[in-house]
Swiss-Prot record:
The keyword Manganese belongs to this UniProt entry's keyword annotation: no
Protein name as annotated: Frizzled and smoothened-like protein G
Biased composition (Low complexity): 550-568
Gene this protein is translated from: fslG
MF-aspect GO terms: G protein-coupled receptor activity
Topology within the bilayer: Multi-pass membrane protein
Length: 574
């Protein structure tokens, strides 16, 4: 049916083209067209109220399949406003552009009587001068709006062939003058303001309002649109995988860390430098995991994304600050105690006497707490745009307070471990490693330091790779916005550019595997088993002593009873 109408219109257009007056376009008559009142803007999304001629009393509409064409027009207008929102810094006279767009898709309507009891509703097209004003002040609109199409944007008016409906004057051509919204714009522009619309899932938040500015929203200039939280670097399913990984590993790792703390820090009577290092490392990892356990209890999204589109900050969200503090102290201490263990391994192999161990304790604790105080006092803890934890998100603060100093520590630890390996290689040339008690005692610490140092080296590589490509990730947001503007499924298939998923997944895996790693290396050792064995022996002895005391007391009481009974018998005999 549509093809027949188009062919008829095209033949008519060719017939009339030579005799068509200048400044006129040719319009197509739709028998289903009606002049109707504007259905109105939705409650939550203003569009064209106060921007239509006659206050929207006569809008050209068609009714088909129980759907008012105005509804479809509103959807098209909303998409146009979305595009206009993101090119607003390239345009002037933005409000007039929105007036024009409203009157293009919600055209004024004229009713004409062509025969007794026969009325025809015809659209009044936007004048070419108004169209030219729109694209001149906003050239990017010219990519979507072609003002040279005369039947959409006539200079004077539109001619409709109503001869089939009984109209005979002017050869059956009925003239409808074009509509210029300039007068309406001049009279009512003070009642309106430029309407920004953000394509889903972006949200609109006024950046000039203190309620929203600098509270964890990530704005997309030049708009007031903010990225969703969490940022859509990956699909929802992949984010769930990372979250589930964190939940499972953090819980297991926390339990393993507590076990090591009890085994080497509390139950162990005779504490050595290595048992202190193991306890300190396990406590550090437990702090990291404790932050995750808090998020599991409260809910990851409630902690990291307390409001739609807003990432948590320590100023407005105390739980974010708490989990960030636990994570920061934990991860700093893990690096420092790993380095401490590497230094002591090297000193043990080389028989070098170091300064007193308490200085390591003071430095490691002091640095972790000092860097925490600096970051917290500057309010630098917040949830990241692509992270499942709160931490330092300011680039220079994170580099100065963690990556640089801890990188130096890891370098020192790596040098120490490399030296230890070289020393072991030298020893292995002369004797079997199994015959060297000193080296055999250091095997497990060496393995743990190598694995932890290797894991942190991987984290460093990932971090600086993200930093190196950060500019590319930011510039790729343009492609993400274009995808949203052209999307028909609310942007479900659109994703921002970020780190590759697999390396990012492993990034979180390593940070939450340390507790399990230390348990496998130390928690299953004879030293750990002996600590618990001694505890069980103490409990058993204590229970035995208690039972014996109760038994003795019970025995003594029965003897007295027997003696009393015997005395009573003697009295009876007397």
């Amino acid at each position: 049916m549509k093809s027949i109408i188009f062919i008829t219109f095209f033949i008519f257009f060719l017939k009339k083209l030579n005799g068509l007056p200048n400044g006129y376009g040719v319009g197509l008559v739709d028998p289903n067209g009606q002049c109707m009142n504007y259905i109105g803007d939705s409650i939550d999304q203003p569009l064209c109220k106060n921007k239509l001629s006659n206050n929207g009393e006569f809008i050209y509409s068609t009714i088909g399949n129980s759907l008012n064409s105005q509804t479809l027009s509103q959807q098209t207008i909303a998409k146009s406003f979305e595009a206009l929102t993101f090119i607003q810094n390239q345009c002037q006279d933005l409000l007039f552009a929105e007036y024009g767009i409203c009157n293009i898709y919600l055209s004024p309507c004229i009713i004409t009587t062509v025969a007794p009891l026969k009325n025809i509703s015809l659209p009044q097209r936007l004048c070419n001068s108004a169209c030219q004003r729109m694209v001149t002040n906003c050239p990017r609109l010219g990519e979507k709006i072609d003002c040279s199409i005369s039947f959409l944007f006539p200079e004077v008016g539109t001619l409709y062939n109503l001869s089939d409906y009984g109209y005979k004057a002017n050869g059956g051509l009925y003239e409808v003058p074009c509509f210029n919204p300039t007068a309406d714009y001049d009279n009512s522009s003070s009642l309106n303001e430029f309407i920004e619309i953000c394509p889903s899932p972006l949200l609109l938040k006024n950046s000039s309002d203190p309620k929203y500015s600098k509270r964890g929203y990530t704005y997309l200039p030049p708009t007031n649109c903010v990225l969703p939280c969490p940022v859509p670097n990956y699909t929802k399913e992949k984010w769930n995988q990372i979250e589930n990984l964190s939940k499972v590993l953090s819980t297991i790792s926390f339990v393993c860390s507590i076990y090591n703390i009890l085994s080497f820090g509390i139950l162990k009577k005779k504490k050595t430098k290595y048992t202190i290092c193991i306890s300190a490392l396990s406590a550090s990892v437990a702090l990291i995991n404790l932050g995750d356990i808090i998020k599991i209890g409260v809910g990851y999204e409630k902690v990291l994304c307390p409001e739609p589109g807003r990432f948590a900050t320590q100023v407005d969200d105390p739980l974010c600050g708490l989990t960030a503090a636990l994570f920061h102290v934990g991860i700093c201490s893990t690096v420092l105690w790993t380095t401490t263990m590497a230094i002591y391994l090297y000193s043990a192999i080389k028989n070098i006497k170091l300064f007193k161990f308490r200085y390591f304790i003071i430095f490691n604790t002091g640095f972790s707490l000092t860097s925490l105080i600096i970051a917290a006092s500057a309010s630098k803890f917040e949830a990241g745009t692509g992270s499942i934890e709160c931490w330092i998100r300011d680039r220079w603060y994170s580099i100065c307070l963690f990556w640089l100093p801890c990188g130096i520590c890891l370098l020192i630890g790596t040098i120490c471990i490399a030296s230890v390996i070289v020393e072991i290689y030298k020893v292995s040339k002369n004797i079997k490693l199994s015959e060297s008690e000193t080296i055999m005692r250091q095997i497990k610490p060496i393995i743990s330091v190598i694995l932890v140092s290797g894991s942190f080296t991987y984290l460093f590589i990932i971090f600086f790779d993200i930093e190196r490509n950060f500019g590319g990730y930011r510039s790729a947001v343009t492609d993400y916005v274009l995808c949203l503007l052209n999307s028909t499924d609310n942007g479900i298939e659109c994703h921002t550019s970020g780190p590759s998923y697999n390396p990012y997944f492993m990034f979180y895996f390593f940070m939450r595997f340390f507790g399990i790693l230390f348990f496998l290396i130390y928690g299953t050792s004879k030293n750990a088993r002996d600590s618990w064995y001694e505890l069980f022996i103490k409990i058993k002895v204590s229970l035995s002593e208690t039972s014996s005391t109760i038994s003795n007391n019970s025995g003594g009481g029965s003897s007295q009873q027997k003696q009393q009974q015997q005395n009573e018998i003697k009295l009876e005999k007397i």
